[in-house]
Amino acid sequence: MKFAVIVFPGSNCDLDMYHAVKDVLGEEAEYVFHTETSLEGFDGVLLPGGFSYGDYLRCGSIAQFSPIMAEVKRFAEEGRPVLGVCNGFQVLVEAGLLPGVLMRNRDLKFMCKTVDLVVENNETMFTSEYAAQETIRVPIAHGEGNYYCDDATLAALKANGQIAFTYKENPNGSVENIAGITNEAGNVLGMMPHPERAVEALLGGEDGKRLFTSIVKWGARHVTYN
């Protein structure tokens, strides 16, 4: 597969995302800057963490208007994989590609540690390499990761199997311990934890690697190469 790593002003996890898919998995990857207007030739889109546009107004609220985001929306509408991690999740929510909102952490503090996640749905293109209800360890690093949605949206997320990951112990106040969700079609995933920081034993664990291998295995079945 060929991945586009989207780079906004203030992104700081783009190098990690690139390393995960290019160096660890051996897939093709290129940086695509926020000013671009085409994703031609790419099979997957990765929106990394960081502080896009300085997180002014709200996290991700300015990045949603970047020229590349119109193409990301079209890409998602075609059913192709879009992954947003941390600030990338915030951008996807602000852009309307995922429901809900991400607010300040419950304790109003930036949190940086490794947490236990539970795989709630292993039947998505992002989670097929995990076991259902498996516990994995993945780092978090955020100040605004407190996921919230109204009751109707929460009921829909549950009914449609859109809750991909939950926290075993809630670090930030997220409703129902939610750590990551997909869109209804299942091809857009947003999550606050950083799987790209858990792809090598040298970094303390490889539990995040299987998220990327899940995408690649989906690509092997669905992507047609010329």
From Swiss-Prot:
Cross-referenced Pfam families: GATase_5 (PF13507)
GO aspect biological process, one term: 'de novo' IMP biosynthetic process
Pathway(s) the chain acts in: Purine metabolism; IMP biosynthesis via de novo pathway; 5-amino-1-(5-phospho-D-ribosyl)imidazole from N(2)-formyl-N(1)-(5-phospho-D-ribosyl)glycinamide: step 1/2
Annotated InterPro entries: Class_I_gatase-like (IPR029062), PRibForGlyAmidine_synth_PurQ (IPR010075)
Gene from which the chain derives: purQ
CDD domains on file: GATase1_FGAR_AT
Protein name: Phosphoribosylformylglycinamidine synthase subunit PurQ
Keywords: ATP-binding, Cytoplasm, Glutamine amidotransferase, Hydrolase, Ligase, Nucleotide-binding, Purine biosynthesis
Main location (coarse class): cytoplasm
Known EC number: 6.3.5.3, 3.5.1.2
GO molecular function, one term: ATP binding
Function: Part of the phosphoribosylformylglycinamidine synthase complex involved in the purines biosynthetic pathway. Catalyzes the ATP-dependent conversion of formylglycinamide ribonucleotide (FGAR) and glutamine to yield formylglycinamidine ribonucleotide (FGAM) and glutamate. The FGAM synthase complex is composed of three subunits. PurQ produces an ammonia molecule by converting glutamine to glutamate. PurL transfers the ammonia molecule to FGAR to form FGAM in an ATP-dependent manner.
Record: active site: C86, H194, E196
GO cellular component, one term: cytoplasm
Catalytic reaction equation(s): N(2)-formyl-N(1)-(5-phospho-beta-D-ribosyl)glycinamide + L-glutamine + ATP + H2O = 2-formamido-N(1)-(5-O-phospho-beta-D-ribosyl)acetamidine + L-glutamate + ADP + phosphate + H(+); L-glutamine + H2O = L-glutamate + NH4(+)
SUPFAM superfamilies membership: Class I glutamine amidotransferase-like
Chain ranges of the Glutamine amidotransferase type-1 domain: 3-225
Oligomer and partners: Part of the FGAM synthase complex composed of 1 PurL, 1 PurQ and 2 PurS subunits.
Compartment(s) where it occurs, according to its Swiss-Prot or TrEMBL record: Cytoplasm
Residue stretches in coiled coil: none
Taxonomy, superkingdom: Bacteria
